Amino acid sequence: MRIDILSLFPNMFQATMGESIIGKAQDNGFIDINVTDFRQYTTDKHNHVDDAPFGGGAGMLLQAQPIFDAMDAIHEQTKDQYSKGRVILMDPAGRKFDQAYAKELAQEDHLTFICGHYEGYDERIRNLVTDEASLGDYVLTGGELAAMVMIDATVRFVPGVLGNMSSPMGDSFSNGLLEYPQYTRPADFRGMKVPEVLTSGNHQKIKEWRMRESLRRTLHRRPDLLKTAKLSREQQLMLEDIKLDEDPTVPD
C-alpha cells in the first residue's frame, strides 16, 4: 500500500510515521508513506497557499491551485504502479472515523490524505476527493493529527503488517464490542489474582469467558455499541444472562 499525505507541516509526520508498527511496516515493504509539502507547488511569489474568502468573512481559505498541482504530481509519480485509490480530505464535517472505516481503507492499494489548515478549503478542492473524514465532533488546528490517527488504525489491517492477523481482529471495536480483560504473569500480584479459568487450559471455557467479559465490559462502558453490534444468538443469550445476574428485576 502507498500512502500519500499533503500537508503544510511535513515534519510533524517524521516521528509518528517512522516508529513502532508503522516504521517496521515501511522497513518491511508493506507500506510506502510519502509526505508532500504542497506549499512547494504554489505559484504565488510569496509562497502563499491561502487567501481571503470571496464575499468576506473571518479567516483564510486554502487555495485550490497548490493542492491540485500537488495531486497532479502524485498521480504522475504513481499512475504506473498504483490506482488513484481513495483521496481523503480531513474535515470536521466528514464521515466519522471508526474501526470499520479503517478496515475498509486497508483494502485499498493507495490512500491520499489532504490535511487542511486555516479556516477551511476552497470548495473546489472537494472535486479531488473520494472521502471526507473526521475523528469526531470537534475542531483541530489542522488535519495532520487526524490523518496520523487514521493511518495508524488503518495500517494495522494491511496484510502482513502485524504478522498474526488474529491480533487486530481481537482489538476493541473489531467485532463491534470492547475487548475482554487480559492478564499476564504473575498469576497472583499483591493479592490480585488472575481468573482461574484463564489458567485452566480449557480452551472452550476460556473462549466463553472472554466472550462474556467482552459483552459485560461493553455493557458497562459503551452500551451504545450494543445497539449496532451484530450479536450471534449465543451472544444475545449471554448478554441477557449478564443483565439478569446484575439486576434480577430486569424483565426477560
From Swiss-Prot:
It is an enzyme of class 2 (transferase). InterPro entries: Alpha/beta_knot_MTases (IPR029028), tRNA_m1G_MeTrfase_C_sf (IPR023148), tRNA_m1G_MeTrfase_TrmD (IPR002649), tRNA_m1G_MTases_N (IPR029026), tRNA_MeTrfase_TRMD/TRM10 (IPR016009). It is found in: Cytoplasm. Pfam families: tRNA_m1G_MT. Its EC number is 2.1.1.228. One of its GO terms (molecular function) is tRNA (guanine(37)-N1)-methyltransferase activity. HAMAP family: TrmD (MF_00605). Belongs to the RNA methyltransferase TrmD family. Specifically methylates guanosine-37 in various tRNAs. Homodimer. This is tRNA (guanine-N(1)-)-methyltransferase.
